[in-house]
Amino acid sequence: MSKILIRAMVLPMTGPEDFYPEGEIGIENDRILFVGEKGSAPDSFIPDQIIDLPEDVVMPGLINTHTHAAMTMLRSYADDLPLMPWLQTKIWPFEDKMSDEDIYWGTLLALGEMIQSGTTTMLDMYASMDQVAKAVLEAGTRGVLSRGLIGNAPNGERAFAENMDLVKNYHGAGQGRIQVMFGPHAPYTCSGEFLQRVKQEADRLGVGIHIHVAETEDEIKTIKEQYGKTPVQWLEELGLFGGHVVAAHCVHLTEEDQEIMAQNKVFIAHNPESNMKLNSGTAPIPELRSRGVVVGLGTDGTSSNNNLDMFGEMRSAAFQQKLVKGATALPAYEVLQMATVDGARTLGLHDVGVLAPGYKADLISINFDQPHFYPRFSIPAHLVYVAHAGDVRTVMVDGKILMQERQLMTIDIKRVCREVEKRAKGIAQGL
């Protein structure tokens, strides 16, 4: 058994007023035993290791609720294009040439970047997900994995079978660090019959569904022309909602769509930087939250972002809403909730996202002893409006240190970078 005592400023994300300027966190193996002010450790707690971080803020690890990790292979390959030309002329042709090994190395690069920027959990959608699982297990992070399913593609049935195998082989793997969902790509790439089969199998196997919904105006137009309804209305008619569904983007929603989301308890993965870069639009996040919809935060893939920095994503989420809705829209603490506790709820993870007794020891420390963090009137405001990836000092998942003093402990990042550079350039040259 391993016992660790961390001394630091602690933001547990258990409530807006909860903050310990001189705090302590006790960890036993993979779980948090106690969180509180200095001196709150019980006499019976004798740590094997003490980590003193007096100038750091320790908070829950960040949760990326929508990404395509291996798309690090395509970073800066296709920029400054709208979604459909971007997908059809650049992204899909490149992805067709990617091997299983390419996806493994691309994912490992993404996980290194995530750890260095304070992300401990991701919801991923891609192909060759056994390779993604392999990378997650090696890196030591937490991952909810879904095989991307384009039902209308020639390999749609094979991909469907691969998603079922993914559930069988990896759901609960890594002492529970890996969970699995089904990943139908979008309403415009899957037939109604295909989506109903996905729903049936997801219910049978007891897993969730991860799908892109209402990302662009073109999608709305296409689905209305085909079915006479918005994508959200059509998916409800099909019966896709009702279980655990994570809908990514949800930029273009009518009032009726928003009410459907609320009534069916659909979870939203909000990706503001990708939505801005691809000119998809501004999602109605304050309106959804006011209806009780749980909204998490995601980066999308690095080919449409172009990084995996959740601190930057938080800042963009706040600023985009303030530009469109007013200065009081989406305050800092609410954005932090989206990146932590509400991210955990979005992924169906009930023991991460806050620092509290019984929860998993998934946490990060941010070095606040830097000029841009003074004066310290508001810790949440600094985390959302000031902090960036390079401020993260320590990362822990399941009580294991994955990064210490910015040094990755589980990934040879220089080797990974060289491998990805070689592989990505090789694919691009062949197109």
From Swiss-Prot:
EC id: 3.5.4.28, 3.5.4.31
Protein name: 5-methylthioadenosine/S-adenosylhomocysteine deaminase
Binding site for Zn(2+): H66, H68, H212, D300
Catalytic function, reaction form: S-adenosyl-L-homocysteine + H2O + H(+) = S-inosyl-L-homocysteine + NH4(+); S-methyl-5'-thioadenosine + H2O + H(+) = S-methyl-5'-thioinosine + NH4(+)
Residues annotated for substrate binding in this entry: E95, R147, H185, E215, D300
UniProt gene name: mtaD
Cofactor(s) named in the record: Zn(2+)
Pfam families: Amidohydro_1
An example molecular function term from Gene Ontology annotations: metal ion binding
Matching InterPro entries: Amidohydro-rel (IPR006680), Deaminase_MtaD/DadD (IPR023512), Metal-dep_hydrolase_composite (IPR011059), Metal_Hydrolase (IPR032466), MTA/SAH_deaminase (IPR050287)
